[in-house]
A protein has these predicted regions:
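Active-site-adjacent substrate/metal-binding segments within catalytic domains
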Residues: 1
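Extended active-site neighborhood of metal-dependent phosphoesterases/phosphodiesterases
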Residues: 6-123
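Active-site-proximal segments of metal-dependent phosphoesterases and phosphodiesterases across multiple
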Residues: 122-152
Length: 152
């Protein structure tokens, strides 16, 4: 058994020791190989970090830790939204040999709704997204690029 609860506590204490804000995203390694703690439990630990900017997010969305950080200026104008998405664990069957999971449609829909609302206030706003595993489209683009497709 892997004591990922203890590791999460130690990680949070370590990051808090720098006294600067930090965040994280979940991926496929957080609860694998006999880990003792699920993502929901890890999220509760991370949410307690003194300098952590982290939330478990909405329960109805696939994954844990889907949230948006709005970087603003002194007047409260959003300069850069940071989107953090759980790229989840493994595909059908739920374990390593079943293939990797992905960012799901409900997560994408939620993300776009949030960004559309920000764009309604300021059409020039751009966002950055952070997640552990790249979307399948990255692989498709990479393969096209290797074959010489300059449109990628």
């Amino acid at each position: 058994m892997r004591d990922n609860r203890r590791q999460a506590i130690r990680f949070t204490e370590f990051m808090d020791s720098f006294a600067i804000p930090y965040t994280m995203v979940f991926g496929n390694h957080d609860c694998e190989m006999g880990a003792t703690c699920k993502k929901e439990e890890l999220a509760a630990i991370y949410e307690q970090g003194r300098y952590a900017i982290f939330t478990a997010g909405r329960e109805e969305l696939t994954g844990v830790g889907n949230f948006l950080i709005e970087l603003t200026d002194a007047a409260g104008q959003v300069l850069l939204p940071l989107v953090l998405l759980d790229s989840n664990m493994y595909g059908e069957g739920g374990w390593f040999y079943s293939g990797f999971d992905r960012i799901h449609e409900d997560q994408t829909r939620w993300c776009m709704e949030r960004l559309d609302a920000l764009k309604a206030q300021d059409p020039t706003v751009r966002a950055m997204a952070f997640f552990h595993m790249p979307p399948r489209e990255f692989k498709e683009a990479y393969e096209k690029m290797k074959l010489g497709d300059r449109a990628v």
